[in-house]
Design a protein with these regions (language model features):
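Active-site Tyr-X3-Lys motif and surrounding loop/helix of classical short-chain dehydrogenase/reductase
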Residues: 56-60, 81, 88-96
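Conserved mid-core segment of classical short-chain dehydrogenase/reductases
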Residues: 77-91, 110, 132-135, 172-174, ...
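Active-site helix of classical SDR
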Residues: 105, 139, 147
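Alpha-helical segment proximal to the catalytic Tyr-Lys
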Residues: 110, 152-156, 207
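Conserved NAD(P)H cofactor-binding loop of Rossmann-fold oxidoreductase domains
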Residues: 74-79, 219
Length: 237
């Protein structure tokens, strides 16, 4: 369906989960994919929270290929809450989730190919929360805001958009009962739901889209839920 023949694509956090699926779909579409992850992979292993690691990674990509056509900032930050999370935990999450996407965009900007695209993976938690998720939520809110700032700053060099996934089961499990039926689309998401949208946003079909956020959550964040409505109940601990 998609053709990214001879395109150079960078995917952070591409060794597993959504990132791995994104990398595989780009590769299947003809792209050369450069992954950076703290987990083992076939291109570059390193900590995205470390400035020198980002610089060494960018240097290798440019030395190997000379340009970048698509930058997918997917790596997920550590989640910790206000009760148990330390200053260091929270700061680390922001370095992975916000600072690294900013710095990689800065490092690669002089080398973007014609029609370049950046897609930042945020989360539906950029607009709603559960208790004790402060570091993750702050990072995802940050990358969502960073998206429209970069879209303006990089106008003419690259389009910049973000995706906010909802419940995505990276094992492709099929859910039944309330887990599925609570979703307006009747199922839980899987990594392909996100990867397909990433490839679309990086394609010429999305050439008039920049600075936007696409929430892919099966409609969950559009439901207005109150205790007692339509069979919904609040169970308090």
């Amino acid at each position: 369906m998609w053709s990214f023949q001879d395109k150079i694509v960078v995917v952070t956090g591409g060794a597993r989960g959504i990132g791995r699926c994104i990398a595989e779909q780009f590769s299947a579409a003809g792209a050369t994919v450069c992954i950076i992850d703290c987990l083992e992979n076939d291109y570059f292993v390193g900590d995205l929270a470390d400035k020198s690691t980002l610089e060494r990674f960018a240097e290798r990509v440019i030395a190997d290929y000379g340009r970048v056509d698509c930058l997918i900032n997917n790596a997920a930050p550590k989640s910790c809450g206000i009760t148990s999370g330390s200053y260091e935990d929270f700061e680390y999450a922001q370095r992975v989730g916000v600072t690294a996407p900013f710095y990689l965009a800065k490092l690669f900007a002089p080398y973007f190919g014609e029609g370049a695209s950046i897609v930042n993976i945020s989360s539906s938690r950029d607009r709603m929360s559960q208790p004790e998720t402060e570091s993750y939520t702050a990072a995802k809110g940050g990358i969502s805001a960073l998206t429209h700032a970069l879209a303006v700053s990089l106008a003419g060099k690259a389009r910049v958009n973000s995706i906010s996934p909802g419940w995505i089961d990276t094992s492709y499990a099929v859910y039944e009962g309330a887990d599925a039926t609570q979703q307006p689309v009747g199922r839980v998401g899987n990594p392909l739901d996100i990867a397909n949208a990433v490839l679309y946003l990086c394609s010429e079909l999305a050439g008039f889209i920049t600075g936007e956020n696409l929430c892919i959550d099966g409609g969950m964040t559009r439901q207005m839920i109150y205790h007692g409505d339509y069979g919904w109940t609040l169970e308090q601990a």
